[in-house]
């Protein structure tokens, strides 16, 4: 077992599949915990997800959650799926919710898995921010492009999709981070 893992789930439509990742990752980690961005809760029932993970951090139900304690309690922090909005916030040090505050505090343990439509992915501001993250030792997965259903257009299109669970695990374990000082 590889220690404790925190999944920071953002408001990307593929967050609806996060339970599959939790179940599979639990086979490899001592604990798999989850923290949702406020907007991601519009896509998923967090009460159901409590059945899959070890702990679900909810800043609304527990406003006294401490970002430093959360970071210190985990060896790995995954932003899965990572929306363009959250990637841009992390790169620019914007801490307007518990998820982005945890990511900024624990950047040395951070792994980002982008998931968005191809137009957002190609945005030069986003690409600049991804380069900024990579240049500061944040591990950003080179995303997969697959045909997927795009909610906004109602059509199947090539988009940036979440990697399969095996690729997530391999990326994390092959790019382990140094501990925080």
From Swiss-Prot:
Changing residue 81 to D: Loss of FMN binding. Changing residue 114 to A: Loss of FMN binding. InterPro entries: Flavin_trans-like, Flavoprotein. Changing residue 43 to L: Binds FMN, but activity is significantly decreased. The keyword Kinase does not apply. Keywords: Flavoprotein, FMN, Lyase, Plasmid. Changing residue 83 to A: Loss of FMN binding. Its EC number is 4.1.1.-. The active site is at residue 67. Catalyzes the removal of two reducing equivalents (oxidative decarboxylation) from the cysteine residue of the C-terminal meso-lanthionine of epidermin to form a --C==C-- double bond. Homododecamer. This is Epidermin decarboxylase. The lineage of its organism: Bacteria, Bacillati, Bacillota, Bacilli, Bacillales.
